[in-house]
């Protein structure tokens, strides 16, 4: 509802927060864990314990009396949030979980697929995801009532299969049949896609550990089986490295700008102790990791990065 608060991480793609604002609700930003780069659930625990109160099984921000309507964890880069802790907080403070699993198709937490642990989960089939339909996505839920309502709204809220009767303002969010067929074919290849992603991530990590140990990959917990969607590392001078790799015909990209550094979200309340999101933004770079990347092409990337840091190029900038 308007002016409700939705807690989301400060490191995410802007679409996460845009979806909140579309409903006239307000994002409440939370910093991320420095190791996994996911929503910091201990920081969330401390915030909810000290700065909120419960009234009739509803959680409110003490300072403004605004209702906290949802927790929106984002499984950043295909890694996963500490869902065990988050589910405990959800139950304790009566705040439902809406999982942004747009990057996490094929990721698992304690044997459960991303997007299936909260009240609802959403996935993206954008062209840069592990499987694609060119665009669009998918919503999943264990709640049949929510599923029926979502389907109803996605078909222009049409109530009669023949006559043009509508009972509320709806949306044209249906996926066209041709793209859905593409998605089914892509899903059949998911095991191979996930296997190749894991191979690429393992090779990068092994190579950097052996020769460039200061390059730090995103860490995962023992509970998490990530899909390795986008191989991203923490390293020095990422802007200079990006420019250097571009001269070699190698495309890389930085991590998302923290949400509180974007003009439309700069005034959002931000829960942080150590500004981890800003530190990650200043030091992280995503490397080529498409399932179409050949082993030979990956070696070219690794060698170019090694050359940058060992030939004096890094020191020259």
List the predicted regions and their residue ranges.
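PLP-dependent aminotransferase class I/II
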Residues: 31, 42, 53-66, 70-73, ...
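Conserved PLP-anchoring active-site segment centered on the Schiff-base-forming lysine
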Residues: 1-48
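Helix C-cap/helix->beta junction micro-motif
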Residues: 23, 92-93, 248, 312
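Active-site phosphate-binding strand-loop segment of PLP-dependent enzymes
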Residues: 35-133, 138-140
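Short active-site oxyanion
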Residues: 4-5, 135-136, 190, 229-230
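Nucleotide-sugar donor-binding loop of glycosyltransferases
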Residues: 4, 10-12, 31-33, 101, ...
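Hydrophobic/aromatic ligand-binding patch that stacks against planar heteroaromatic rings
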Residues: 18-20, 89, 113, 178
């Amino acid at each position: 509802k308007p002016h409700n608060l939705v807690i989301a991480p400060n490191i995410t793609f802007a679409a996460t927060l845009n979806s909140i604002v579309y409903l006239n609700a307000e994002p409440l930003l939370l910093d991320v864990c420095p190791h996994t780069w996911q929503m910091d659930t201990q920081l969330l625990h401390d915030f909810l314990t000290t700065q909120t109160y419960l009234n009739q099984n509803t959680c409110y921000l003490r300072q403004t009396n605004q209702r906290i309507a949802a927790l929106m964890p984002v499984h950043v880069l295909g890694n996963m949030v500490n869902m065990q802790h988050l589910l405990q907080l959800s139950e304790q403070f009566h705040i439902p979980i809406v999982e942004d699993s747009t990057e996490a198709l094929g990721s698992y937490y304690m044997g459960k697929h991303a997007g299936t642990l909260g009240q609802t989960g959403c996935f993206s089939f954008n062209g840069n995801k592990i499987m694609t339909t060119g665009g669009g996505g998918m919503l999943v839920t264990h709640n049949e009532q929510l599923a029926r309502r979502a389907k109803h709204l996605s078909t222009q809220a049409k109530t009669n299969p023949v006559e043009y009767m509508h009972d509320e303002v709806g949306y044209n969010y249906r996926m066209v049949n041709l793209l859905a067929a593409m998605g089914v074919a892509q899903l059949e290849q998911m095991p191979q896609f996930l296997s190749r992603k894991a191979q690429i991530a393992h090779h990068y990590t092994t190579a950097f550990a052996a020769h460039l140990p200061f390059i730090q990959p995103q860490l995962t917990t023992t509970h998490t089986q990530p899909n390795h969607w986008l191989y991203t590392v923490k390293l020095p001078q990422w802007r200079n490295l990006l420019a250097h790799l571009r001269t070699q015909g190698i495309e890389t990209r930085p991590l998302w700008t923290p949400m509180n550094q974007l003009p439309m979200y700069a005034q959002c309340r931000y829960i942080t102790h150590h500004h981890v999101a800003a530190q990650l933004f200043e030091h992280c770079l995503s490397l080529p990791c498409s399932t179409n990347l050949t082993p030979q092409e990956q070696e070219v990337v690794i060698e170019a990065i090694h050359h940058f840091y060992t030939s004096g190029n890094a020191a020259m900038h």
